[in-house]
Amino acid sequence: MITVERVAELASYVRADGADQLASDLETADAGVFSGTERAMKLRFLLAATLRDERLSASTRTAIQTEWQ
């Protein structure tokens, strides 16, 4: 399972690529989440949405795809 620290790291990559809203969404992914399963589903959804953003650099995209798998 992805750690909070890793999510923060990915969010910083996304923010550096200019996708501030997506980075904020990743940083606050734990808000209102009550279980590990719910958190995992929410993060998977957010990572998928992030991958669709065309502003991401190749290195950011690769880092996110690694977590996606």
Regions found by a protein language model. Give the residues of each.
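C-terminal-biased regions
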Residues: 1-69
